[in-house]
Amino acid sequence: MTSLRAIMLSATESNWRLFMLRKSDSAFLAFQQAVWRRDDYTCQFCAFRAVDYLEVVNVDGNYLNNRLDNLVTACGFCTQCFFLESIGKGTFGGGSLIYCPELTQGELNALCHVLFVAMINGFACTLQARNLYRSFKLRHQIVEKEWGEGLSNPALLGCLLVDLPHHNVDTFKGEALTKLRLLPDMVRFKTEIEHWSRAALTELIFS
């Protein structure tokens, strides 16, 4: 597999609308199958592999540019990072912003995939997984203290990024977003996690 792509937490005024519109486009839905097959059903940001509950995101951030070479496979944890302003809308995404400069966003998402499977399937390391995840969740308090009340809510931060003048957004990205990570919420991803966990358990049993 080629090197993983980096994730920059982001929010825009129109990308979410375009991302959702194409989900009802039968031609695009067929086209995304080609993207998943090319990428071997593997998230290009965290290396998580699954047959179901995958998404397709646009590399250049332009959701009008739907050329095959501009589309890559992403899991739900990584996908939501590109649409901060829309997290929590309906059934889309869920999580909190935490202070975690020692891990990249992709590394944190990959770790959460492992932790959630351990917690759901009741592996021997379940308690350790639960404690580690809890310790990450507590880091949202640092964000609230250092950057402002409510800013551990990704949708709120996303709306702030959309509304900020362009030059201020670049400054904020340099000062804050390089140290912030989006921690996926286990409850909001319950359906996907349970499905992935069953698949992982089946693979262990029959491998």
Regions flagged by a language model, labelled:
Residues 1-16, 81-207:
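Extended charged
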